[in-house]
């Protein structure tokens, strides 16, 4: 467990390496992005609750923490859980975590880079067309000893919010996995079936030495060699011909031109015939044609030629020599293997963030790496579940304040509340209904009539919510008795996983609980 307490710098080290790009490794970027541990500036939750913050935009960042002893996932569940808070949003960049592989050579924090071997990469990433929650694991080929990245198919979409978001990955020994966002399941599947490239190669492959015979005929249809062009087939007949049945309309002025010189136009005084040439009056539509059926020479309209046949070609027939589509013969795959337990990942020696982003002030907090999903859930209940209530109330208050400042009035405030509800419902429909039941009811009543909608949403605007923030000395203060007991129990159990648990879980506070209660009472 990592909560970024005051002694965090004793455990975490920034990288001094450079990231090389291009095939010839000629372009290098130093990992000089700044890291800091501080409280959030946007929608702060619990008093004194700080996290690891990526401070620089458009820079390479790398920071890591090595465990006292490696975590071995073999034969056990593996849980990866952490919080992300996108204080400035996420327009282009990553916010994922890497579980670093425990290798014989070991991991040197000063040299941590994109080349450092990792076991799992998990978390949000967005840039251009990319917008997904990564789940990548590196799998070792038992025949060659080489590692290959396996990417989850059809990944979940991340939650791009300025409030905290909880990402949880659970991998079971039966090779199943499940991804949760804010405790809601977003993606589940099997390591053996839902990754690309697949863990296990095919049992048979095309024979690379097999070649298509020179006399192989793979043209299914051919022109009939016995067919001849009919004697009455006229290839020169035009596609269209004049309509001989057409009659010139009455009133057609065939002797009148469509345009005439403008009788009112006069040659400009500055016009010089020697320099500018002979002057001609500009043309205007012939006024006599306005009421007539038409002017100028009458021409018959054209129609499709019934005798037209076009160029003759022989009809197609089945090719008597056709042998079908040629395919090489298959042979047993010499590189075939079957790994039935890819969830037996390589031992994990530490965690790290190796990121590039165009958005600064991305905050990470409350990291859990272990074997017990119930422990992770209990840890989230004492941390994330408490702060998110406070953060969402602040977000709602800010949204309402902005609507008032913009002079949106009653209709604008209704729209603001509805937009907030819709935004939350896209990520968590049930949670949105619980948090904003009046808006949910109002939208439902809209199907019965506009007046009902206005009345119900008006009820929403009748009251405001207040959030009281109280502080105590120190970064982390004592949790409520029951919560504190749960947190200590989680910390003691997690020690067996090899992950450092600093001073037990100390982020939940009586003050924090009081803030939630006060906010509810103020309503």
UniProtKB/Swiss-Prot annotation:
Q: Name one GO molecular function term.
A: unfolded protein binding
Membrane topology per record: Single-pass membrane protein
Q: Which residues cross the membrane?
A: 441-461
Q: What if the gene is knocked out? A: Leads only to slight reduction of virulence. Severely affects growth and displays an altered morphology, when the calnexin DNJ1 is also deleted.
Q: Where is the composition biased (Basic and acidic residues)?
A: 221-231
Gene3D superfamilies given for it?
2.60.120.200, Calreticulin/calnexin, P domain
Compartment list: Endoplasmic reticulum membrane
Those parts of the protein on the Cytoplasmic side are 462-523
Which InterPro entries does this entry report, sorted A to Z?
Calret/calnex, Calret/calnex_CS, Calreticulin/calnexin_P_dom_sf, ConA-like_dom_sf
One Gene Ontology BP term is: ERAD pathway
* Alphabetically ordered keywords of this record: Chaperone, Endoplasmic reticulum, Membrane, Transmembrane, Transmembrane helix
Which residue intervals are topologically Lumenal? 1-440
Region feature (Disordered): 191-275
Q: What does this protein do?
A: Endoplasmic reticulum (ER) chaperone that functions to stabilize non-native glycoproteins and retain them in the ER until they are properly folded or targeted for ER associated degradation (ERAD). Is essential for avoiding plant defense responses in cells with defective N-glycoproteins processing. With co-chaperone DNJ1, coordinately functions during the tunicamycin-induced unfolded protein response (UPR). During biotrophic development, the UPR-associated function of DNJ1 appears to be more important than that of CNE1.
Instruction: Indicate the family of this protein.
Output: Belongs to the calreticulin family.
This chain's protein is named: Calnexin
Q: Which organism is it from?
A: Mycosarcoma maydis
């Amino acid at each position: 467990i990592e909560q970024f307490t005051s002694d965090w710098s004793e455990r975490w080290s920034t990288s001094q390496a450079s990231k090389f790009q291009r095939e010839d490794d000629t372009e290098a970027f130093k990992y000089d992005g700044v890291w800091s541990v501080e409280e959030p500036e946007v929608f702060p939750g619990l008093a004194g609750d700080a996290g690891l913050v990526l401070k620089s935009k458009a820079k390479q960042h790398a920071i890591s923490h090595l465990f006292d002893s490696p975590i071995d996932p073999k034969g056990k569940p593996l849980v990866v859980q952490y919080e992300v808070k996108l204080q400035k949003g996420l327009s282009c960049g990553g916010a994922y975590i890497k579980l670093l592989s425990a290798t014989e050579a070991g991991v040197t924090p000063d040299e941590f880079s994109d080349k450092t071997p990792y076991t799992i990469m998990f978390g949000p990433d967005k840039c251009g067309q990319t917008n997904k929650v990564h789940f990548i694991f590196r799998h070792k080929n038992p025949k060659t000893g080489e590692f290959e990245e396996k990417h989850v198919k059809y990944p979940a979409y991340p939650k791009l919010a300025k409030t905290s978001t909880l990402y949880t990955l659970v991998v079971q020994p039966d090779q199943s996995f499940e991804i949760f966002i804010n405790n809601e399941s977003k993606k589940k599947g099997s390591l053996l079936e839902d990754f690309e490239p697949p863990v296990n190669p095919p049992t048979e492959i095309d024979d690379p030495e097999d070649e298509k015979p020179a006399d192989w005929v793979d043209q299914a249809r051919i022109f009939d060699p016995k067919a001849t062009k009919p004697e009455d087939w006229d290839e020169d007949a035009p596609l269209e011909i004049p309509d001989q049945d057409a009659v010139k309309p009455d009133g057609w002025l065939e002797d009148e031109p469509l345009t005439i010189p403008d009788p009112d136009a006069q040659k400009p005084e500055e016009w010089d015939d020697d320099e500018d040439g002979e002057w001609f009056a500009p043309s205007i539509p012939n006024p006599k044609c306005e009421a007539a059926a038409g002017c100028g020479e009458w021409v018959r309209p054209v129609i499709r030629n019934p005798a037209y046949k076009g160029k003759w070609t022989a009809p197609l027939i089945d090719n008597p020599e056709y042998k079908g589509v040629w395919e090489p013969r298959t042979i047993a795959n010499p590189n075939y293997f079957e790994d039935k337990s890819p969830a037996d990942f390589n031992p994990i020696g530490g965690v790290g963030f190796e990121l590039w982003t165009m958005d600064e002030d991305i905050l990470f907090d409350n990291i859990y790496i272990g074997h017990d999903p119930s422990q992770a859930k209990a840890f989230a209940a004492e941390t994330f579940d408490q702060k998110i209530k406070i953060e969402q109330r602040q977000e709602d208050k800010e949204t309402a304040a902005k609507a008032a400042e913009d002079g949106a009035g009653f209709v604008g405030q209704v729209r603001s509340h509805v937009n907030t509800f819709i935004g939350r419902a896209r990520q968590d429909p049930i949670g949105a209904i619980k948090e904003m039941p009046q808006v949910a009811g109002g939208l439902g009543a809209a199907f019965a009539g506009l007046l009902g909608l206005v009345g119900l949403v008006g009820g929403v605007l009748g009251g405001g919510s207040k959030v009281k923030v109280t502080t105590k000395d120190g970064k982390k203060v004592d949790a409520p008795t029951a919560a504190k007991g749960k947190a200590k129990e989680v910390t003691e159990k997690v020690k067996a996983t090899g992950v450092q648990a600093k001073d037990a879980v100390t982020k939940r506070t009586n003050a924090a609980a009081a803030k939630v209660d006060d906010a509810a009472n103020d309503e």
